Swiss-Prot record, chains B, D:
Organism: Dictyostelium discoideum
Family, as annotated: Belongs to the URM1 family.
Subcellular location: Cytoplasm
Name recorded for this polypeptide: Ubiquitin-related modifier 1 homolog
Gene3D superfamilies: 3.10.20.30
Gene for this chain: urm1
Length: 282, 96, 282, 96
């Protein structure tokens, strides 16, 4: 249902820019106002982070935070469409911030040229309404999950490798968190990195776009449609998607359960036996 | 009984790169999921079984689906696989 | 299967740039060489055309053609992520060409600041291996289809509206064409335009990324996976995709059948009772 | 017999904005698809029926799926709908 409200705070240049978005059913003027008044933190400005940031900035999310310690390399550009050749060697967070500012100067962008760690996470995350996990390694995924649970933020989590991708939302509307589904980190030798296995640009394009849409659904309060308690699995080679039902919030979960054992951030590199950075592991 | 097994997220690489396996147990009407997993380890998977099975269950990081729903909703490893069930093993991805 | 070949024509800067793509299974060095030696024509530099062009240029398609008569408006920017505010008023084809050249200077881009019509289509299309339909109206869709059938080019067709999208490949590997499935144009009053119904950026992001991947599969000869004879239907609100089986090539089809009645391009604005441009219909 | 009807591509707007309709015909075992379409026109759709039905079949631009496959693979309008079939009506999209 389209929601029209008489008193709104959108400026004429916002009406002009977002017109075809706010006439979309279930967005409406009130939905657009929610987007403009919200803040989203994106962990990772790489293959997934680029489409997420491009679509969220163009949609008019009021404040975007971009966290990435890496710098742009030419070998990133086959899939990281938010960077430019001229950004080679500079921070990915800054490079992506520059691109999205040229696309939409109405929004605010904060860049964090730092590794997201147990030391930096809480100070950064507290300023945002929603977190997007667009990272590339196991340790960061557990860290982001726990930080979201401890601060009560919904987490839109996407991942990709080769021809495949996966996406779901954690810690949303009393749904499960990452640890509810994966209480124990995978053995190190079973984890394939994009730098080893390869990954195609359109795969991260699909998953990143899907992550941006989940953020929009959460912020416009389209609760029923949110991918919570459901996991979307994508096989690009066969062009088949599968939406499967996963377990709900687990009362025995170590971080979001009834008697959590994790009540503050831990050392995730130790927990996962791996680094916070894909490249650091090489 | 016939069981359809699907592998994704790279797990198919351990199983001859085949994403779909159809198995028939002509002498059974049902089979404990644990036995099916061990059967897969011993018959379909030839090497590096520790990338699939640890402590007689799937290793951490593998999500098991029974007819498109999380196995935890059906009792996990103690589920009894029935004729025509589809069991999916998904290795979770971490890249981006 | 990864294909390694000893004699290849990739230059060192191409190996550097496409390394993580060419190590992906079923791409390989030979697949990358195919991409670098291919040409793709994209009809429409709007919501779908932007992600298609960004991902195909970054993947290293040798030559991209961009056809669009429109100019960039601020109201496009909520979903057309390949343009910039500073491109306001200039040709969409030129604006998008500028963005992708900054992303990958190794490829060649041709811009056509013209409406794709029965008069211009054949001259443009003959220079390309594959065509992507990223247009926004019925008349152009029939025109592009017939031009592809008459010149024997595969067609990767995507469309989107509101929260939904659809994608399939036509005229590929003896599969059906658009007219096989839709022999008669829809009544004008049943066609909703994006300018009336709205559309969300991530929806065109998903469909455009999927179109780019189909192009890559066709060019790298991953025939089995191509969405031919299958239609992918996407409902973004419920986060559900459905891949459905559609009819094969129809012997009675007016353009690709055994006794075609359409043997050269016709007047599609008359056939469809509508214009070649969404905005012209306003 | 029970039939599940799904609408997409905007067609649901003609049907009370509901994307899924379950219909039961307690006196039938099967029903010609043509009769089902006319039933939908006369009972589920209240106005502007020409946006759905023209000349006693669906209008051009609507793709009909029978259990996830194109109705042309099953004889089109002459198909007989059976118990538990899912019939999907999709309006093709043209925007971009
Ligand atoms: Zn939990
Ligand atoms: Zn045809």
């Amino acid at each position: 249902m389209e929601k029209y409200i008489k008193e709104h705070t959108l400026k004429p240049n916002e009406i002009e820019r977002y017109g075809r978005q706010l006439i979309t059913p279930d967005i409406g003027v009130s939905g657009q106002m929610s987007l403009c008044n919200s803040s989203v933190l994106i962990i990772g400005a790489g293959g997934l982070g680029c489409p997420v940031a491009l679509y969220l900035s163009s949609a008019g999310i009021g404040t975007l935070g971009l966290v990435d310690y890496d710098t742009v390399e030419i070998s990133n550009l086959h899939r990281q469409i938010g960077h430019r050749e001229s950004s080679k060697g500079i921070s990915k967070a800054v490079s992506l911030s520059k691109t999205i500012s040229e696309l939409n100067s109405l929004i605010k962008v904060n860049t964090y040229e730092t590794t997201f760690t147990s030391e930096t996470a809480m100070e950064i995350i507290k300023n945002y309404d929603i977190v997007v996990d667009a990272s590339d390694n196991v340790a960061t995924r557990y860290l982001v999950n726990d930080a979201c649970v401890l601060t009560g933020k919904p987490l839109v989590s996407g991942s990709a490798l080769k021809w495949e991708g996966q996406i779901t939302c954690y810690n949303y509307n009393n749904g499960p968190c990452y640890r509810c589904i994966f209480p124990t980190p995978p053995p190190v030798e079973t984890v394939t990195k994009c730098s080893d296995g390869g990954v195609l640009g359109p795969i991260v394009g699909v998953i990143g776009s899907l992550q941006a849409l989940e953020v929009i659904k959460i912020l416009t309060n389209n609760k029923e449609g949110v991918l919570s308690g459901r996991l979307l699995i994508y096989d690009g080679m066969s062009a088949v998607f599968r939406t499967v039902r996963i377990r709900g919030k687990q009362s025995g979960c170590n971080v979001c359960g009834d008697k959590p054992t994790v009540t503050q951030l831990i050392d995730y590199t130790q927990f996962c036996q791996s680094n916070y950075s894909e490249s650091a592991g090489k | 009984m016939k069981v359809k097994i699907e592998l994704s997220g790279g797990l198919e690489l351990l199983f001859d790169k085949k994403k779909v396996h159809e198995i028939e147990f002509s002498d059974k009407n049902e089979i404990p999921l644990k036995d099916l997993i061990l059967y897969m380890r011993d018959n379909l998977l030839k090497e590096r079984s520790e990338l699939f099975v640890v402590d007689d269950t799937v290793r951490p990081g593998i999500l098991v689906l029974i007819n498109d729903a999380d196995w935890e909703l059906f009792g996990g490893i103690s589920y009894n696989v029935e004729d025509k069930d589809t069991i999916i093993f998904i290795s979770t991805l971490h890249g981006g």
